[in-house]
């Protein structure tokens, strides 16, 4: 019984070991013929691989000299989306790169806006923050709320609950007999 308590405590604290940031939006494509086809120039092709690794330059915490260009918005075209379908757009990046990321979506493009969100005594670091490694993922939502990549976890949890119910039923029946 002690082993089960230890396993439960370890599973309870397991999420604290996750060291990444994620920004997620759920979108629904409209009933439109403006969606890009696979013949178009695409940054993300939904039929092949809906995940792309990126290195993006964030807006600095301390602005550059007046008039210097500030580029923090990136646009990515998405092909293979189906009309009237719900999708999840997810951006993930390591926690060691503190950044504020804003995701937006229009009919054919994902817009990623990235800003550095840290403070340091090193002024050059504040003016020129390091590039942020980012993974951008687009995947369909099943039943309108469940990302496809979560299905194995849902299946595993379902099996564990089923096994627990069978064990509890057997224990209850055994306890009733005694």
UniProtKB/Swiss-Prot annotation:
GO cellular component: endoplasmic reticulum membrane; glycosylphosphatidylinositol-mannosyltransferase II complex; mannosyltransferase complex
KW Endoplasmic reticulum (keyword) present: yes
InterPro entries assigned: GPI_ManTrfase_II_coact_Pga1
Pathway: Glycolipid biosynthesis; glycosylphosphatidylinositol-anchor biosynthesis
Signal peptide residues on this chain, from the entry's feature table: 1-20
Primary location group: endoplasmic reticulum
Lumenal side: 21-152
Topological domains, Cytoplasmic: 174-178
An annotated Gene Ontology molecular function: glycosyltransferase activity
Ranges annotated as spanning the membrane: 153-173
Membrane topology: Single-pass membrane protein
One GO-annotated biological process of the protein: GPI anchor biosynthetic process
Name of one Pfam family that matches: Pga1
Residues with attached carbohydrate: 48-49, 106, 115, 122
Sorted UniProt keywords: Endoplasmic reticulum, Glycoprotein, Glycosyltransferase, GPI-anchor biosynthesis, Membrane, Signal, Transferase, Transmembrane, Transmembrane helix
Oligomeric and partner information: Part of the GPI mannosyltransferase 2 complex composed of gpi18 and C167.09.
Function (record text): Essential component of the GPI mannosyltransferase 2 complex. Responsible for the transfer of the second mannose to the glycosylphosphatidylinositol during GPI precursor assembly.
Designated name of the protein: GPI mannosyltransferase 2 subunit C167.09
Source organism: Schizosaccharomyces pombe (strain 972 / ATCC 24843) (Fission yeast)
